[in-house]
Design a protein with these regions (language model features):
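Short secondary-structure junctions and interdomain/linker hinges
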Residues: 23-30, 57-61, 80-84, 100
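An accessory alpha-helical subdomain
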Residues: 31-79
Length: 182
């Protein structure tokens, strides 16, 4: 039931309800909160554009799984905010979503070896971790490393690091270069 008052029209009530669904599905969901917050803060038009996208795709009133919301957000960013795709991919990986789906298409999973230097963001590296690498772009070797516990089959990474090209004085827990020739 929709009521109209002198203060708000039926269309405005509909928009408020749809914005509430958008925020519940993306902002109030831990997996997508940081990227949604960043997009809201960085672009005043984001909420309007994303809401229009969800309405056009007939998704605003559909229940969506965590994975479906990630796929939708990735598709939207691919079309309208390509610079933010990397953040959606990081959120996708950290939420334990499949590394075989589109948001993780650039993730390298086969026989990944740790780099010479990295800055640990969380967790502790150990050789038993299965490493995956997400390059930040196609032109550099810089990117994010994620470590997964193979023996317990945990979907979420237990380790995350950012590759750095050379050792810096102010990094937290970098891997030390043991090569004497450098």
């Amino acid at each position: 039931e929709v009521l109209q008052t002198n203060e708000i029209s039926v269309n405005e009530l509909q928009t408020a309800r749809q914005l509430s669904r958008l925020l519940d599905g993306f902002y109030n969901t831990t997996a997508w909160q940081a990227i949604t917050r960043k997009l809201i803060l960085d672009d005043n038009d984001f909420l309007r554009r994303f809401l229009e996208f969800l309405i056009d795709k007939n998704l605003i009133d559909q229940p969506m799984s965590l994975e479906k919301r990630g796929l939708v957000l990735y598709e939207f960013c691919s079309m309208h905010y390509p610079a933010y795709k990397i953040m959606v991919t990081i959120a996708w990986i950290e939420a334990g979503m499949s590394l075989k789906k589109k948001p993780a298409e650039k993730v390298k999973t086969k026989r990944q070896m740790p780099p010479e230097y990295w800055e640990v963001i969380y967790g502790n590296y150990k050789e038993s971790l299965r490493l995956c690498f997400l390059p930040i772009d196609d032109n550099t070797q810089n990117g994010y490393w994620f470590g997964f516990e193979s023996e317990i089959q945990k979907a979420e990474p237990v380790f995350k690091a950012k590759e750095i090209m050379e050792r810096c004085q102010n990094t937290q827990s970098p891997q030390i270069n043991t090569d004497k020739s450098s």
